Amino acid sequence: MGMTIAEKILAAHAGKKEVTPGEIINAKVDIVLANDITAPIAIKEFEKLGVKDVFDRERIALVPDHFTPQKDIKAAEQCKMLREFAQKYKIKHYFEIGRVGIEHALLPEEGIVLPGDLVIGADSHTCTYGALGAFATGVGSTDAAIAMATGECWFKVPETIKFIYYGKLQKWVSGKDLILYTIGDIGVDGASYMAMEFIGEVIDNMPMSGRFSMCNMAIEAGAKAGIIVPDKITEEYVKLRAKRPYKIYNSDQDAKYFEIKEYDCSRIPPVVACPHLPSNVKPANELSHIKIDQVVIGSCTNGRLEDLREAAMVLKGRKVHPEVRMIIIPATQKIYMQALKEGLIEIFIDAQAVVSPPTCGPCLGGHMGILAKGERAIATTNRNFVGRMGHPESEVYLSNPAVAAASGVLGRIGTPEELGL
């Protein structure tokens, strides 16, 4: 029996010829990641182990992105702990303010995660890296601590669901819409502890930005990982960034899948996930009665250059509604710089949006755009649980960047078509 790409990567890193779903394995990891919320816990657990050094100072990434620039004393102390740990153990991939970006945009951009890698991160959206053809999954801080010491972690081999996307995308529909639509179909537990493998002609023609968005939100369906078999688009992205060898894996034709689902993308419009679950999905054009107070365009889901370009196409020559606050967050410094060079930042400021430095910020209700009681936001982020962006009685709607930008101009949820685009 053949294996899926997820099974092949796990088998290779466990030193086995094959693995089967449900099997418990111990495997060598390529990268261990933690941020300013999860790393302090991992560091404390690491110090308890009494080891003299980390397993590999070039295979650990510490990214203080959630509350950067540090929003208060506690956040500053947590970042100080990361900084001191990185200095003590000479961690190569520690990203200070000025170099820092949102971790799941930053690591691929820097060539730290590559195809065929086995990656664990003390952050649930570590699954983003599946877009590169890596098996990447979130773990707890204790597992991250052990891996920083040993370079290994335990895994339960997941079943895999294959998702096939075909047809022609409608205008203003992106990878964000496809993953929201998929989660709306299968539910927030529809892929619990499984790998979601995305394939089909639509995926074949999708840029890396859309692939990152889709794999990023696999966890919102309960998945252990989202993954896409690498192709020419992947290799074009990776070859400019890779500083070490990597290996391409694919799925065998006779691989066994838990389920196979197919979607005709020509029938999928721009969609919005309504409060308070990413699965509460409705067509954007059915929500024109929903007034909004805030727009957030950014995050590890949609803060890449292509996302900013999409938002700028909608905002160019227009103004944000006077009763709406629009916050735009480039995911990394390099993205910010390129957006400056392309004139995107000027478009945003002319539209009366505010541009933030790279940070997770409002996505997790941290800072830089917290909602008050009764307020509503439409955001390109990945979660809209109760209280996610602020007050428990606030609401968050999830969309792609074009819909978010159009909504900011209209003062209510709407689409670019309503602006004549």
Swiss-Prot record:
Protein name: 3-isopropylmalate dehydratase large subunit
HAMAP family: LeuC_type2
Signal sequence residues: none
Domain of life assignment: Bacteria
Lineage of the species this protein comes from: Bacteria, Pseudomonadati, Nitrospirota, Thermodesulfovibrionia, Thermodesulfovibrionales
GO molecular function: 3-isopropylmalate dehydratase activity; 4 iron, 4 sulfur cluster binding; metal ion binding
Pfam families: Aconitase
Catalyzed reactions per annotation: (2R,3S)-3-isopropylmalate = (2S)-2-isopropylmalate
Pathway in which the depicted protein is active: Amino-acid biosynthesis; L-leucine biosynthesis; L-leucine from 3-methyl-2-oxobutanoate: step 2/4
Quaternary assembly: Heterodimer of LeuC and LeuD.
Transmembrane segments: none
Residues involved in [4Fe-4S] cluster binding: C300, C360, C363
GO terms (BP aspect): L-leucine biosynthetic process
Species the sequence originates in: Thermodesulfovibrio yellowstonii (strain ATCC 51303 / DSM 11347 / YP87)
Family indicated by similarity: Belongs to the aconitase/IPM isomerase family. LeuC type 2 subfamily.
